[in-house]
Each structure stands twice: as C-alpha cells, then as structure tokens.
C-alpha cells in the first residue's frame, strides 16, 4: 500500500497527550478530523502503527492533535519526529486541473517536441506553485504553474507541455 505524507509531529503540547504537527496537506480539516485514521511512520520511514484522531485544533502554524487512547504525555513523547501519512485509497478526488504533488514530481517537461527536463520538486512561494525542472547540463528551471506557461498536464503519459516565456530561462 502507498502512503503519502501529510505532516510531522514536531513536539508535544501540554501533559494531556496533545501533539504539535507541522502540516503539509491542503486538507488539514479533513485529514485531522475526529475519527480519521492515519498511518504513523518513524524517522527511518518505517510503518509503526495506525492511529485514530481523537481531537484536532489549530494553533498558530501548527495543527494540535490527540490520538485516541493516548491521553498522556508519557504515551506520546516517543512520537516526536514521526510522520503522519494517509493511505492512497483515502486521497480526495480533485477538480480538473488540480493534482497531487506525487502525481507531478517525476513528469517529463516538453516545449514542443523538445525535452526540457523532469520535475523534481514543487515550491510554494506565494500565489502560484513553482515547478523545479531538472535539466541535463543546465541549471534547474523554475516554472510557475500558470496557464500561459503550463499548457497541458498528461498524468497517464507522464508528460507536461509548456511554453517557456521570455525571461523564465536565464540560460537562453
């Protein structure tokens, strides 16, 4: 079974079994809702166990969660640094033109018939995501995910068609 990272437990919160989670999901309210089941992975990315969310609230930049049947700091302190993941079968269906990062990373990028490179990372600097494209013999290319640049995303064929606008490629 495939799992996808949704957050990391960075610390405990108080004495009643709450944990601070640095979330990396766009669906925190759903992922951390009471009764949701998540997979717990250790620092070596090994599956530890399935956990059920007992409570969730936001505090500043963190999601504060508590696991069912784990209501004391001594029970949960060992989970600091562990990752929370969701099973692939539990991923939400997305609207047209929306993609999960794991679907985009690894796709080949083409301008016309010319291979530009492969998407290796996605950045979130502001209003739009920026795709980092690894190229042979050149520096990485930063492509904003906006309609004039990204023309077509073909997940089944692992291909993205783009138009590299003037000023985006400083090596040309």
UniProtKB/Swiss-Prot annotation:
HAMAP family: Ribosome_mat_RimM (MF_00014). Binds ribosomal protein uS19. Belongs to the RimM family. An accessory protein needed during the final step in the assembly of 30S ribosomal subunit, possibly for assembly of the head region. Essential for efficient processing of 16S rRNA. May be needed both before and after RbfA during the maturation of 16S rRNA. It has affinity for free ribosomal 30S subunits but not for 70S ribosomes. GO terms for biological process: ribosomal small subunit biogenesis; rRNA processing. GO terms for molecular function: ribosome binding. Gene3D superfamilies: PRC-barrel domain, RimM. Keywords: Chaperone, Cytoplasm, Ribosome biogenesis, rRNA processing. This is Ribosome maturation factor RimM. The gene is rimM. Its main location: cytoplasm. One of its GO terms (cellular component) is ribosome. Residues 95-168 form the PRC barrel domain. The PRC barrel domain binds ribosomal protein uS19. It comes from Streptococcus pneumoniae (strain JJA). The keyword Repeat does not apply. Pfam families: PRC, RimM. It comes from the Bacteria. The keyword Repeat does not apply. It is found in: Cytoplasm.
């Amino acid at each position: 079974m495939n799992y996808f990272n949704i957050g990391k437990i960075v610390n405990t919160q108080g004495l009643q079994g709450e944990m601070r989670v640095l979330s990396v999901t766009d669906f925190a309210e759903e992922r951390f809702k009471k009764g949701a089941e998540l997979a717990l992975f250790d620092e070596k990315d090994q599956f530890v166990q399935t956990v059920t969310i007992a409570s969730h609230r936001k505090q500043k930049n963190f999601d504060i969660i508590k696991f069912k049947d784990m209501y004391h700091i001594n029970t949960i302190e060992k989970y600091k640094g562990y990752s929370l993941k969701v099973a692939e079968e539990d991923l939400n269906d997305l609207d047209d033109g929306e993609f999960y990062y794991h679907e985009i990373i690894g796709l080949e990028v083409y301008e016309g018939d010319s291979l530009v490179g492969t998407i290796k990372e996605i950045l979130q600097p502001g209003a739009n995501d920026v795709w980092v494209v690894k190229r042979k013999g050149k520096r990485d290319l930063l492509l904003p995910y906006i309609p004039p640049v990204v023309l077509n995303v073909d997940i089944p064929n692992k291909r993205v068609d783009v138009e590299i606008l003037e000023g985006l490629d400083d090596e040309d």
